[in-house]
UniProtKB/Swiss-Prot annotation:
Entry note: cofactor: Binds 2 [4Fe-4S] clusters per subunit. One cluster is coordinated with 3 cysteines and an exchangeable S-adenosyl-L-methionine.
Organism: Prochlorococcus marinus (strain SARG / CCMP1375 / SS120)
Gene responsible for this protein: lipA1
Lineage: Bacteria, Bacillati, Cyanobacteriota, Cyanophyceae, Synechococcales
Name listed for the protein in its UniProt record: Lipoyl synthase 1
Residue intervals of the Radical SAM core domain: 50-268
Pfam families reported in the protein's UniProt record: Radical_SAM (PF04055)
Binding site for [4Fe-4S] cluster 2: C64, C68, C71
Length: 294
């Protein structure tokens, strides 16, 4: 499979925004010694999000115990203790940034008995203690199928529970070798089962070698497992050691994914565009919660 990384189309070229807020957010994160997935995963939207005073916090990192070949987060299989001050620092950042909606994600921590579920809970508690009106979205790993760990997170009552399906099942062995497609679907199905009031969310990348029909089948699977919100974005290879881009999906095709997701499958929201990432414009969920209250 040949890489297309050197032929990036115009619709994927992002101008670096000039805004004093970007420096403020970056300095605050540095002062509080907090990681963001925006920085660690080289997100193309980092300038826009920082300019808007938002960030997706990456806890328990920065190293990940899995080495998915599409991801730019550093691999680190060493056993590392959790930082007990991290939740408090995260809560302080949310307060100082005045966030109305916060996204908290993590690296995979397969070295921990509960996969880091307890740290997620502590972060939820810290955010609610420092900023009671802030809605909370979690983007969680699969916890290796540890459903007790999953229940621990659900019992903390996040407003949105996100777990990314990432790609089509045919490509799992290549792109997500330590993940299981059916296990991820099972996790998403359990969101509604455990907490009917929590909105469930999942995202996938295109451009890894899937077909459009396979994308639609994933949408069908997500719908069948009670997912409310879906994000679809273009895969961009972080470097030569990562999986190459197989194709650049056009904006028109992304619009077709969105239309299919909303009209055929009836998701509450489908965010689909070349630069969409799982937490891009995540704050719009507050409007969604007003339209579809639970």
């Amino acid at each position: 499979m040949a890489s297309m990384n050197t032929h990036k189309p115009d619709w994927l070229r992002v101008k670096a925004p000039q805004h004093e807020r970007i420096g403020y957010v970056a300095d605050l994160l540095s002062d509080l010694n907090l990681n963001t997935v925006c920085q660690e995963a080289s997100c193309p939207n980092i300038g826009e999000c920082f300019a808007g005073g938002t960030a997706t916090f990456l806890i328990m990192g920065p190293g990940c115990t899995r080495a998915c070949p599409y991801c730019d987060i550093d691999f680190d299989k060493s056993v590392r203790s959790l930082d007990p001050s991290e939740p408090e620092r995260l809560g302080e950042a949310v307060k100082r940034l005045g966030l109305k909606h916060v996204v908290i994600t993590s690296v995979n921590r397969d070295d921990l008995e509960d996969g880091g579920a307890s740290q997620f809970v502590s972060c939820i508690d810290a955010v609610r203690a420092s900023s009671v009106e802030t809605t909370i979205e979690l983007l969680i790993p699969d916890f290796c199928g540890n459903w007790d760990a999953f229940k621990k997170v659900m019992n903390a009552s996040p407003n949105v529970l996100n777990h990314n399906i990432e790609t089509v099942p045919r490509l799992y062995k290549r792109a997500r070798p330590q993940g299981l497609y059916k296990r991820s679907l099972e996790l998403l199905r359990r969101v509604r089962q455990e907490s009917p009031n929590v909105y469930s969310k999942s995202g996938l990348m295109v451009g890894l070698g899937e077909t459009d029909d396979e994308v639609l089948q994933v949408l069908s699977d997500l719908h069948d497992n009670n997912v409310d919100i879906v994000t679809i974005g273009q895969y961009l290879s972080p470097g030569t050691k990562h999986l190459p881009v197989d194709r650049f999906v056009t904006p028109d095709q992304f619009q077709k994914y969105k239309e299919e997701g909303q009209t055929r499958f009836g998701f509450l929201q489908v965010v689909s565009s070349p630069l969409t990432r799982s937490s891009y414009h995540a704050g719009e969920v507050k409007r969604l919660m007003q339209i579809y209250p639970r």
